[in-house]
């Protein structure tokens, strides 16, 4: 199950009585729900002990994390190391700082391609779908040049979370004889999955990360430098099946200047949803034992937002209102929850549910390639509503729901399969 589901169970059962052992995997990712769950489970352990109940055992698993920090947080718990079956990976850094990591990655790819044996595949890390599609297009264009004719065939595949499932599977298929596969991926390929046949990794040293400015109340998605832990995680992808090599498009000095660990999400996000969940469990975040405590400003801003949404009575001594308790039951941003419980008053609950479902998916439009861009945009324009994007999304969903052949509807109108 996900962390969010377990947190919602804790709202109705503060002892989580049906569990005796809970295993938390990928702990190093430090998502908001992971960090909150750490604190909730510590409280559950303490409460069970005080009430002479069955002990709750926790097993925290991670491929790479700040072990001392975790052990100290969990009352100096013992640490067990399980060596993985990995092979040596040779690390290469650029001698000089690179101004364009995309260009450096492509140059490195073709240096490998022209010198390495066939069927030794390559994994390139980029920040997002737009960069990935751009690089795929450049790779395919370059491979058509006369200079590369007669060499090993190079086939490029994208890999990111909003890609259709059948397209994602292409990235997992081993290369055929006399071909080389290059997978261009986001950080989804760092820990969550293992790609067979990867011999070389090209690490651009950047990632797209969500940040929150409490002073403005705005969340942004920025390209930022990875941590040292991420750098080593990426390089390890080249040593899963045999000896490999990692080419970093940054210098060794730049590596040493990187943060040792990735900044936890709870320190760089809007806390209103987190605080709402904690209040529903009966916990005030100001007294809650978190591994890394958010700033006072971020907490204050979240309390103000919840007060504006009528989820809490006051910001000084926050207690949930009846509406707040209802809002906490939804696995949604509090703004969406507030809209849902208000919708019946305006007689538009069905439309609101449809709209929030559409807003909770990835981009509903398929990103067109160079060959069918005009056709795709023409299809997308059929849904355009002058009243705004929300009405456009409702129109798309309404037509989708009425379509007899859902797959044909997506394919013909160049829409994502995310809904």
Listing of model-derived features with the role each one plays in the protein:
Residues 56, 348-368:
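Structured, non-catalytic alpha/beta "coupling" segments that mediate domain-domain communication
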Residues 1-346, 355, 376-377, 387, ...:
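P-loop NTPase motor module signature
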Residues 367-375:
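A short, terminal or domain-edge coil/loop segment
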Residues 380-383:
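A short, surface-exposed interaction/processing loop segment used at functional sites
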């Amino acid at each position: 199950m996900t962390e969010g589901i377990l947190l919602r169970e804790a709202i109705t059962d503060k002892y989580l009585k049906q569990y005796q052992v809970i295993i938390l995997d990928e702990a190093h990712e430090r998502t908001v729900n992971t960090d909150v769950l750490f604190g909730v489970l510590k409280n559950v352990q303490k409460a069970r002990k005080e009430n002479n109940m069955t002990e709750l055992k926790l097993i925290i698993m991670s491929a790479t994390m700040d072990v001392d920090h975790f052990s100290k947080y969990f009352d100096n718990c013992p640490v067990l190391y399980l060596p993985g079956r990995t092979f040596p990976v040779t690390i290469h850094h650029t001698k000089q700082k690179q101004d364009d990591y995309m260009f450096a990655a492509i140059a490195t790819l073709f240096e490998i391609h022209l010198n390495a044996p066939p069927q030794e595949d390559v994994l390139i890390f980029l920040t997002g779908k737009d960069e990935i599609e751009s690089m795929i297009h450049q790779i395919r264009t370059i491979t058509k040049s006369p200079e590369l004719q007669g060499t090993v065939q190079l086939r490029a595949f994208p890999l990111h979370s909003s890609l259709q499932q059948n397209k994602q599977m292409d990235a997992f298929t081993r290369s055929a004889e006399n071909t080389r596969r290059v997978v261009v991926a986001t950080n989804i390929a760092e820990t969550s999955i293992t790609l067979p046949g990867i011999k070389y990794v090209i690490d651009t040293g950047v990632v797209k990360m969500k940040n929150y400015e409490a002073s403005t109340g705005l969340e942004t998605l920025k390209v930022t430098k990875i941590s040292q832990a991420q750098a080593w995680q990426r390089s390890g992808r080249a040593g899963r099946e045999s000896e490999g090599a990692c080419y970093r498009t940054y210098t060794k000095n730049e590596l040493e200047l990187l943060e040792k660990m990735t900044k936890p999400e709870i320190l760089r996000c809007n806390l209103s949803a987190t605080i709402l969940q904690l209040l529903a469990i009966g916990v005030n975040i100001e007294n809650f034992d978190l591994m890394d405590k958010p700033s006072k400003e971020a907490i204050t801003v979240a309390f103000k937002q919840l007060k504006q949404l009528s989820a809490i009575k006051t910001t000084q001594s926050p207690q949930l209102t009846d509406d707040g308790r209802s809002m906490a039951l939804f696995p949604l941003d509090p703004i969406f929850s507030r809209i849902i419980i208000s919708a019946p008053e305006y007689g538009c609950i069905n439309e609101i549910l449809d709209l929030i479902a559409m807003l909770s998916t990835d981009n509903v439009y398929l990103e067109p390639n160079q060959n069918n861009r005009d056709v795709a945009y023409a299809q997308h324009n059929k849904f355009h509503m002058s009243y705004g994007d929300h009405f456009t999304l409702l129109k798309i969903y309404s037509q989708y729901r009425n379509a007899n052949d859902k797959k044909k509807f997506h394919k013909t109108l160049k829409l994502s399969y995310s809904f």
